[in-house]
Swiss-Prot record:
InterPro entries: GATase_2_dom (IPR017932), GFAT (IPR005855), GFAT_N (IPR047084), GlmS/AgaS_SIS (IPR035466), GlmS/FrlB_SIS (IPR035490), Ntn_hydrolases_N (IPR029055), SIS_dom (IPR001347), SIS_dom_sf (IPR046348). One of its GO terms (biological process) is UDP-N-acetylglucosamine metabolic process. This is Glutamine--fructose-6-phosphate aminotransferase [isomerizing]. The active site is at residues 2, 595. One of its GO terms (cellular component) is cytosol. It catalyses: D-fructose 6-phosphate + L-glutamine = D-glucosamine 6-phosphate + L-glutamate. Catalyzes the first step in hexosamine metabolism, converting fructose-6P into glucosamine-6P using glutamine as a nitrogen source. Residues 283-422, 452-590 form the SIS domain. It comes from the Bacteria. It holds the Pfam family GATase_6.
Length: 600
């Protein structure tokens, strides 16, 4: 959610900043801007809309080797050119970009900035105006920066230019991700490493409430007390090709096709030398010492958590609760005596999940993060991490991270089951290999998926997904995918709940996508399909081989029933993708959405 880049060196800063912002497009944004230190002062370019539009207004003839850039996802103030970053102080001495939310910005306005005329509706402008006010009291820029930050409550990642000190960028962070990249006679700033892989793979991780003075040949990290901190850079384990589409028209389609490889990679990463599943002994012991597992997540990760609950309870016979992170803090249940928390987040930066983690850490409870980004905030602040090994996921709508989460959760459940002496009736690694094979088959059936999307979804206003048992949870994820990228009003329901109200919405032609992968509820979901057909619905039944019946729209390759969610979701991802194409929607960057949701 939002993205920051910065560059200081000898090269053309404008192009590096623009390319960096393009690499951050996946995070979601509605406007973008850059500011560069030119010969006659700081020049700001910003636009509502795509970075391509911003490129059109950037003057190629302006020479600059220092600058900052930003993609904005609106929180305070509508998406507009005025509200886009960078923002400047009244005198234009200071120019600033900011990710996060300043919770007390109105109070700061009232107490310190009564005489300032504000240009935008944003909380961000308060920071840059406060910076100017603090300098006006006689403080040095560094002192003013520290004072300014001490007066702010909330989250921030900040990049600041000072027109009177053009050879440095001031940087700070609190509860919002930010890295400093190290180069040869240049340095960079970025919300994540992908933005600046074009110039370096060496990055320094910043901690909360740290200030950094970035110059061409040096990086100085200090705490809010002004004490210098030494920290070595790390090498980003990414390749520039990982964040390119290659021959694919969209990242989403590329990432759907990568899922078989991801599953095989996960199997390999979590096997010991004997081919047995083997997790960290400390993770296993911490879970075995607990009396209940609490899974905390948002969105797609929450849906993965629902399936994960089934894995853990069925395999390991341990009780599990799954909670939406944004509600957990306000409605925390009565916890058991020895709870263990699992946080699921693709980015590892989800603000709602982090807020809960902070609470449970303060309570002294052990926590595990399942994430695609080791070294992320959740990974650092939890006791343990299980990586997804899915590779960068660029499309806003999650696909391969979801199936990776399911695979890792199944491995975790099997490992705990083994430690408890619970015997599975199947070989998990073998069956996951069959899942990967089935995924390959499904990814080769794109024409069939396109035809289903055209038949059922090309012109509809709404759509319902139904399933029983674990198919219900897969249906929730299918509905989310469809609404995210095609803007169809799509909802997932438990098949048995239709008659308790939702069936009132069924009318002639309403598409209902039904999942039938579980033998013990196959007849039940078939009965639900008949109920909606009787009211005029247009049914699309996706069943598992061996459970299919005449009239089914698509039959999945057979896999072990427990792992059916990993294959059942593939057609739903592809159908959503093609529905979005038929409706001429922006598949990789859907409106109003952000990939990494870093505000609460």
């Amino acid at each position: 959610m939002c993205g920051i880049v910065g560059f200081i060196g000898e090269q053309d800063a404008k192009e590096i900043l623009l390319k960096g912002l393009e690499k951050l497009e996946y995070r979601g944004y509605d406007s973008a801007g850059i500011a560069v230190q030119a010969e006659n002062g700081v020049v700001v370019y910003k636009e509502k809309g795509r970075i391509a539009k911003l490129r059109e207004i950037v003057d190629e003839n302006v020479a600059a080797s220092v600058g900052i850039g930003h993609t904005r996802w609106a929180t305070h103030g509508v998406p507009s050119k005025v509200n886009a970053h960078p923002h400047q102080s009244t005198s234009k001495r200071f120019t600033l970009v900011h990710n996060g939310v300043i919770e007390n910005y109105e109070l700061v306005k009232k107490e310190y900035l009564q005489d300032v005329t504000f240009v935008s509706e944003t909380d961000t402008e308060v920071i840059v105006q406060l910076m100017e006010q603090q300098v006006s009291t006689g403080l040095s820029v560094e002192e003013a920066f520290r004072n300014t930050l001490s007066l702010l409550h909330g989250s921030y990642a900040i990049g600041l230019l000072d027109a009177e000190n053009p050879n440095m960028i001031y940087v700070a962070k609190n509860k919002s991700p930010l890295l400093v990249g190290v180069g040869d006679n240049f340095n960079v700033v970025a919300s994540d490493a992908m933005a600046m892989l074009q110039v370096t793979d060496q990055f320094i991780e910043l901690m909360d409430k740290e200030i950094v003075i970035v110059m061409k040949e040096s990086i100085t990290i200090k705490n809010l007390q002004g004490e210098t901190i030494e920290r070595a850079p790390f090498t980003a384990e990414l390749d520039a090709s990982d964040i390119e589409k290659g021959t694919y028209p969209h990242f989403m389609l590329k990432e759907i096709d990568e899922q078989p490889l991801v599953i095989r990679n996960i199997i390999q990463k979590y096997q010991d030398e004997n081919g047995e599943i083997e997790l960290d002994q400390d993770i296993r012991n911490a879970i075995l010492d607990s009396d209940r597992i609490y899974i905390i997540a948002c969105g797609t990760s929450y849906h993965a958590g629902l399936v994960g609950k089934q894995f853990i309870e069925k395999f390991a016979k341990m009780p599990v609760e799954v909670h939406v992170a944004s509600e957990f803090s306000y409605n925390m249940p009565l916890l058991t005596e020895r709870p263990f928390f699992i946080y699921i987040s693709q980015s590892g930066e989800t603000a709602d999940s982090r807020a809960v983690l902070v609470q449970t850490n303060e309570m002294g409870h052990k926590a595990l993060t399942i994430t695609n980004v080791p070294g992320s905030t959740l990974s650092r602040e939890a006791d343990y991490t299980l990586p997804l090994y899915a590779g960068p996921e660029i499309a806003v709508a999650s696909t391969k991270a979801y199936t990776a989460q399911l695979a890792v959760l199944s491995i975790l459940a099997a490992d705990i089951a083994k430690a408890k002496g619970e015997v599975l009736d199947f070989d998990l690694t073998h069956e996951l290999g069959l899942v990967a094979n089935a995924m390959v088959q499904l990814c080769d059936q794109k024409e069939e998926m396109d035809a289903l999307a055209k038949q059922f979804l090309a012109t509809t206003r709404n759509c319902f997904f139904i399933g029983r048992s674990v198919d219900f949870y897969v249906g929730l994820e299918g509905a989310l995918k469809l609404k995210e990228i095609s803007y169809i009003q799509a909802e997932g329901f438990a098949g048995g709940e239709l008659k308790h109200g939702t069936i009132a919405l069924i009318e002639n032609g309403t598409p209902v996508i039904a999942l039938a992968t579980q033998e013990h509820v196959n007849l039940g979901i078939r009965g639900n399909v008949k109920e909606v057909v009787a009211r005029g619905a247009n049914p699309c039944i996706i069943s598992m081989k061996g459970l299919e019946m005449e009239g089914d729209s698509f039959v999945l390759p057979a896999v072990h029933e427990a792992l059916a969610p990993l294959v059942a979701v593939i057609p739903l991802q592809l159908i959503s993708y093609y529905a979005a194409l038929h409706r001429e929607c922006d598949v990789d960057k859907p409106r109003n959405l952000a990939k990494s949701v870093t505000v609460e």
